[in-house]
A protein has these predicted regions:
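N-terminal amphipathic/basic-hydrophobic helices that include classical n-h-c signal peptides
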Residues: 1-38
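"…together with the soluble PPM/PP2C metallo-phosphatase catalytic core" -> "…together
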Residues: 36-301
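Cytosolic, membrane-interface loops and tails of multi-pass inner-membrane proteins
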Residues: 63-88, 302-343
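Hydrophobic membrane-spanning alpha-helices of multi-pass integral membrane proteins
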Residues: 99, 242, 346-364
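Juxtamembrane "helix exit" motif at the C-terminal ends of alpha-helical transmembrane segments
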Residues: 103-110, 359-373
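Alpha-helical transmembrane segments and their immediate juxtamembrane interface regions
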Residues: 128-140, 366-405
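Internal alpha-helical transmembrane segments of multi-pass membrane proteins
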Residues: 144, 207, 339-347
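Structural signal for the N-terminal portions of transmembrane helices
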Residues: 281-292, 360-361, 370-377
Length: 405
């Protein structure tokens, strides 16, 4: 069975194309949604069903919060809390249901077997990450270490199901090491766990993680479509549709939160797609996958460094309120719009980070076959993050009337 799944998931490589990217990006949307009737049918039965299932599940969870609220409600107390109303933090259930329904809705189409194989692998392998995250949402007693190991276990399980692991990153020496299966699997598990936890760490404001995830999935899907990997492109579309259903209830008013279960599941899905894209398509630089994920990765690395080395006595796993999104809310939104409600200020924060996310994602699409271009874009993205963070942390870029605060 593993061999069969691996044949479906990995057994094809998209052809390199000589035409420029400028001539391919715009036709993508036309060919995807208008020009090809079979693709339009897939959109109707897969993505729309995923979005509808996710949205309906969110509505149901919100309407029944009096039944499950004693377990699922996110308290308003805490250093990282930016909401004023008790809110269910189990939106990950809705996203998982949406992806599952999208998977089931594609069963009528024999041509979608490859996409179903990818989705089934994501659903099955993502369960450890999702379950441990959901347990934390419901009990608040699952340690950071246990959740990290669960996300890494999802990466190993993904390899066990599909046989796919990172075998090249275009780095001399490291590529040779990745030729050994054990090293390749462990490296993949570490990368998957890192991205999953990075997605969780940026989950701080209404619409932030969902919006960032939609942008990242769009970039992955667009690259997959450009190199002819239709199955992976539509996998991204189905997952994005499930996220979109949740997004409607999460932004801007925050009727339901993603929770650790949703963040870890989405983080795993993104990480696994990041692994699949260059492994299935030899023409795609692995650095483009890293570039798409660079915002949450930079956030988690900088947070660990800040807590461990810049804040004496602060545990690297303990939460704080000085992430980039936290500073953007306090230094920009609250100063520029002091008379708006807290919930409105909350909803206004995410778009600032969406804009930041779009830049590296656009560069990843543009340079997806160019290692130098992606590496330079990575450096620019990291330097931009540091520059913005320093400006906000040291009370610059504030409205003039509040400069003495």
């Amino acid at each position: 069975m593993r061999a069969a799944v691996r044949t479906i998931v990995v057994g094809r490589f998209a052809l390199n194309r000589s035409n420029t990217i400028h001539g391919r990006i715009s036709p993508f949307f036309i060919s995807l949604f208008l020009a090809n009737p079979s693709m339009l049918e897939l959109l109707r039965y897969d993505a729309l069903m995923a979005a509808a299932a996710s949205l309906c599940t969110c509505i149901l969870l919100v309407l029944t919060k009096s039944w499950h609220g004693s377990f699922s409600i996110d308290s308003t107390d805490g250093i990282q809390k930016f909401h004023t109303q008790p809110t269910p933090r189990i939106g990950g259930i809705a996203i998982a249901v949406g992806v599952l329904v999208g998977f089931a809705a594609s069963s009528h189409d024999p041509a979608a077997a490859e996409k179903r194989a990818i989705l089934s692998a994501i659903l099955l392998a993502g369960m450890p990450a999702f379950i441990f995250g959901l347990l934390e949402d419901l009990t608040k007693r699952v340690s950071v270490r246990a959740r990290l190991l669960a996300t890494m276990a999802s990466g190993i399980l993904g390899w066990g199901i599909t046989g796919v692991a990172l075998t090249h990153v275009n780095v001399p020496g490291l590529d040779w090491l990745l030729g050994f299966t054990a090293i390749s699997v462990l490296f993949t598990a570490f990368a998957v766990g890192g991205v999953a936890n990075a997605i969780n760490i940026i989950d701080g404001f209404n619409g932030l993680t969902a919006g960032v995830t939609l942008i990242m999935l769009g970039a992955f899907g667009l690259i997959a479509r450009l190199v002819g990997d239709i199955a992976l492109a539509f996998t991204c579309l189905v997952i994005a549709a499930a996220v979109a259903g949740f997004f409607v209830m999460n932004w801007p008013r925050g009727k339901i939160f993603l929770g650790d279960g949703g963040a870890y599941f989405l983080g795993f899905a993104l990480a696994w797609i990041a692994v699949l894209l260059p492994e299935r398509n030899a023409s795609v630089s692995p650095w483009s996958s890293l570039l798409i994920c660079i915002y949450p990765i930079t956030e988690i690395i900088f947070s660990i460094y800040r807590r461990r080395y810049l804040r004496e006595g602060h545990n690297a796993t303990e939460p704080d309120a000085i992430h980039l999104h936290s500073l953007a809310n306090r230094r920009w939104i609250k100063k520029l719009f002091p008379n708006t409600s807290i919930i409105t200020q909350n909803g206004m924060t995410a778009p600032l980070l969406w804009i930041y996310t779009i830049l590296p994602c656009w560069a990843a699409v543009y340079f997806h076959q160019n290692r130098i271009g992606t590496v330079l874009s990575l450096l620019v993205s990291i330097l931009l993050y540091i520059a913005i963070y320093r400006k906000l942390a040291f009370f610059r870029w504030l409205p003039r009337k509040n400069n003495n605060e």
